[in-house]
Amino acid sequence: MMCSRCKKIHVELAKTCEPCKQYLREYNKKNKEKARQYYEENKEQSRQYYEDNREKRLEYQRQYRASIHGKYIYIQDSARQRNLLFELTEDFVGDKTDDPCFYCGQETTFETRNSLDRLDNSIGYIKMNVVSCCGMCNNMKKCLDPITFVERCSQISLHNGHDGDVTKYWNTVKGKSYCKYKSHTKRDFELTKEQYDNFRKNDCTYCGRKAIHGHTNGIDRVNNDVDYTVENCVSCCGDCNVAKHTYTTENFIAKCVSIASKEHSIPEGIERQIKMILQR
């Protein structure tokens, strides 16, 4: 690709070559006031350009994230923002993300490159602590340790008629009152209090967990484009709700089945972490 600034050929999947990007970073650092003034004077023009070229920009971003360099920069920036140790080289990230997903076996493709997952979330990005991980597994796993993640997927697989096993490692959630839940949601909420209470008392649709021993199930909207209606809601524990995210029921269960059917060589000594989201 030809650099848009110096017109020299470079190998990065970016409009500007690395030397020119470094020059521009240093220039902008030294000329912050000029850069701010330029932005203010051209704000409307820039906004219109981004609006007119939205699809083009999204495709470019997708291609960049699918490149080894783009994936490396993304992971490195993510680690820096979370104050995590990062000791990986770009070559290592490229080789590791070429591997199939450690959890489900999904391959890296030209369109979508796998990312990295830290096996032990108390440790940063070092070679012995990272595995290749597809975007969906990474999003479903959140802050769980790998054993708990695989075991939960195994129970979901079993509950939906496939091979699997049950696990005791789930998070206990008390839930919210009808009024509090209704006031906090940003969607139209058409459920009555009686309907809401019935959903909370029923078993989780995805994993089968019962609302006992201080645990209360919640509600999942089957179609995330539709509001809280009786037809669109099912009983769902908090852990399955977070893991399912905005995925379809079919894709969520299929991913759990893929994970449950795969063998995993997980190192010993990793502490259990049953909460999916941790406060940092």
Kindly give the residue locations of the regions a language model identified:
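Histidine-centered catalytic micro-motifs used for acid/base chemistry in nuclease
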Residues: 99-103, 112-121, 202-205, 215-224
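Short linker/helix segments within small regulatory modules
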Residues: 9-16, 115, 119-130, 218, ...
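Contiguous alpha-helical segments
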Residues: 1-110, 126, 135, 139-205, ...
